[in-house]
Each structure stands twice: as C-alpha cells, then as structure tokens.
A protein has these predicted regions:
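Active-site and donor-binding regions of nucleotide-sugar-utilizing enzymes
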Residues: 6-30, 36-154
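C-terminal alpha-helical cap of glycosyltransferases
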Residues: 360-368, 389-404
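A nucleotide-sugar donor-handling region in carbohydrate enzymes
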Residues: 122, 126-197
Length: 404
C-alpha cells in the first residue's frame, strides 16, 4: 500500500542537502510512494523533471508549526523528514521559529543527517562566529546518514549516496574538441556555487576570503604552464583569472548531465569545498580531485612568521587577504566541525587535500595528477575501492523504510 511522506527543508538549505533529500524522495516515488517536498523557492530548479511535488515554504516559516501539522493531516502523511536536520535547526531556531512541535507529532520524524552530527565537531564554526549545534538536532533516533559524507560503518541509517552515471555514451572526446583542447592540453574544472559569491556573504571576513582566495589560486597555479586550461562552472565569472587569458573559460551553471560530461572531459577537479556534491560526481567519473583547505588562522604578520620560507607573492597576498580563518568549506569555515567527520573516513582517501598557504604542495600535487599517469591512476584506484564499498550499502529507500 502506498504512503505519502512529507520532506521539510529550511529555505536556507544548500543545493547539496536538498539534492540528497531528492535522492531519497525519488527512490520512494520509484517504489510507489508519494513525496511532498517543502523547500525554499531558490532550489526549485532541482525539482524540474523529477516528478516530486515541490512547495515553496518561504512565506510560511513563521507559522511553520500550524502549516506543517495541517499539511500532515490533510495529506495523511506517514512520516516527516528534515532535510537536513542541521540546516533546519541552525536556520529556524535562531530566528525564533519554534521546533519543539516536532517531538509531539504522531508520525515518525526522520532526520536526514548530511554531516553525521554525532561524529562532527560541537560547533558550526564560521571563523569568528561559532554557534553550538542545538542539542535537539543531535538527539533524533531516526537518522539517515548519506555515504559520502558519513563513514560506511556509521551505523543504522547509512545509505549509498554517490551519484550514478547516466546512460549516455562517453563524451570526453567530443567535449574536449568543443572546448578546443589539444591532445597535450590538460583541463582543470573548478565548480563554485552562488553561496560562495562575495556579495552574498553576511560577514566581512567571509566576503574578503571569497574575493581574495581565487586571486591566490590563479597566481599560484599559473606555474603549471601554458598547457593547463581552467574551466569554471558557476554562477558568475571570476575576475581573479583574467591573467590566464583564453586559458580560462567560464561555463556558467549547467544541468547535471552537462556537468557530468564536463567532468569526463576534464583531467582534474579543483575544489574549495570538501563536501561538495561535485566532489561526489568526480568519484563516480573517476576524476582525480584536489581539495584546497586552510588550517591556519591569524594576521598577515603571524602567518608569515609561521612560514619562514614564505615567498614574496604569498607575503603580498596575505597583506590583502589576512586575517585568515580555517576552512574546509570556503569561504565559510567549518574546519573544526568537519575534521572529526573526515578522520578515519575512506571518503577522505578519494581526493588529495592541500593547504591554501603551501604553494609548493599545491602546485606539485596538481602537476603530478595532471601529468604523471601513475599518480592519477593511484588516486583513481582509491576512488574505485571507495565506490565499490558504497555500492554495497543499502539504497536510500531501504534505509528510509528501516526507520518506519
């Protein structure tokens, strides 16, 4: 007998969390159930062609309890899923939206725990601001843990969350020809998201890093040579790469199928977001990936003193960019929050992490993965092993129904 399930995402939920929620919703729909998905208007594009009913919730936030309880009654919902539990609590609790009604609902409430909160750090560290994770967000018994990011052995609720390759012929040769790449050229793909734009940051230190980090990357990676091209997939062209001339190409935001084709045409993914869904796509595509992170904090003088061999270029850049804060998700932070999640996690073996300020390691790691076939093959082998381990896990619908 089919059932109706309600999914609730906070309006500020990122594309990654909503995309993971949609993966579960589509699996339930494929097995005959119905899903009503409440989410912000900004993510409506994700629902196109999915067959999942999306209802914008932006105008209902301050009457959420009444709205949700009435909807559950009207639609006779069998369950409520929070997409994801962290964004629901961190977005709604600070603005005074009461969430204690969730504990009193007569139906199961399931927490999509995108970050595996019981393993993560206790604070949502945003550089200078580090609000604690609300205890109720950690308390849900019914949790769905997508892999990645959770460890495959994290316990009940884990499910395979790697994207699947669509049934399409290989596109590498055709796309590389379209991009004007020669046989000796190497293509680095750099995806960015709207939430990373400088003008959308709420804190000055985030906006400064959103502007300045691409400047440092462009200057440092120029050392890779004329054979290396960069393809930027994102909402807005970056002026930081102007010195690359025609070797920098801006693609804009693209549909998932096009992104998959571009990744298959690329030789390296360069990311500043450790947990980006584009990184998951790279694992599926067998695309070597470098993730840039920063574990250092301090003023320009403090950071230079800690690196006696700092180049003149790094010193000049720090004069504009510092003070820095640690990050695993640029420009926000979350270094302390995510570090425990990545410890002893096989997901962390599917990419090479490099420090923002270690210019030699950044250049040489990228150079090896672009030009040394054995280095690229070794990383692909780790991706292959991880893929097989994830594929052995329960699917999203199976994990979901395990909590009903």
């Amino acid at each position: 007998m089919s059932a109706t399930h309600l999914f609730l995402a906070a309006p500020a939920a990122a594309f990654g969390e909503v995309s993971t929620g949609l993966r579960i919703a589509r699996a339930l729909a494929a097995s005959g159930d119905r899903v009503v998905f409440l989410a912000g208007a900004d993510v409506a594009v994700l629902f196109e062609g999915t067959g999942i009913a999306h209802q914008a919730i932006d105008a209902e936030i301050f009457s959420l309890q009444r709205f949700v309880t009435r909807l559950i009654e009207r639609e006779r919902c069998a369950s409520l899923t929070l997409v994801d539990v962290t964004s629901v609590y961190l977005t709604l609790d600070p603005i005074g939206v009461p969430l204690d009604f969730l504990e009193r609902l007569a139906i199961p409430v399931i927490a999509l725990d995108f970050w595996n909160l019981r393993q993560a750090g206790p604070q949502w560290d945003f550089g200078r601001d580090a609000p604690p994770i609300p205890p109720p967000a950690r308390a849900f018994e019914r949790r769905l843990l997508p892999v990645p990011i959770a460890r495959p052995d994290a316990g009940k609720g884990v499910f395979a969350a790697l994207p699947e390759r669509g049934e399409r012929p290989p596109a590498r040769g055709a796309v590389r020809a379209e991009l004007g790449l020669g046989a000796d050229d190497r293509l680095v793909i750099v995806p960015t998201s709207r939430w990373q734009l400088p003008e959308l940051q709420q804190w000055k230190h985030h906006a400064r890093l959103a502007r300045q980090v691409p400047v440092w990357l462009a200057a440092t990676l120029a050392r890779l040579g004329e054979r290396v091209r960069l393809l930027h997939v994102g909402p807005q062209r970056s002026p930081a790469w102007e010195a690359w001339g025609s070797r920098y190409r801006f693609e804009g935001q693209v549909a998932p199928a096009r992104l998959q084709d571009l990744m298959e045409a690329a030789d390296l993914l360069l990311s500043l977001n450790t947990t980006a869904t584009t990184g998951f796509t790279a694992i599926t595509a067998g695309l070597p990936a470098v993730v840039v992170m920063n574990s250092h904090a301090g003023s320009a003088d403090e950071l230079v003193q800690a690196r006696p061999g700092a180049s003149d270029g790094l010193r000049a850049w720090l004069a504009d960019a510092a003070p820095l804060h640690p990050f695993r998700l640029w420009p926000l932070g979350l270094f302390g929050f995510l570090t425990p999640v990545l410890e002893d996690n096989p997901f962390a073996e599917t990419f090479r992490a490099v420090e923002l300020l270690d210019e030699e390691a950044m250049v040489e790691t990228c150079r090896a993965l672009l030009f040394d076939d054995s280095a690229a093959a070794a990383l692909r082998d780790r991706q292959d092993r991880y893929r097989e381990r994830v594929r052995a896990l329960p699917g999203p619908a199976e994990a979901f129904r395990g909590w009903l």
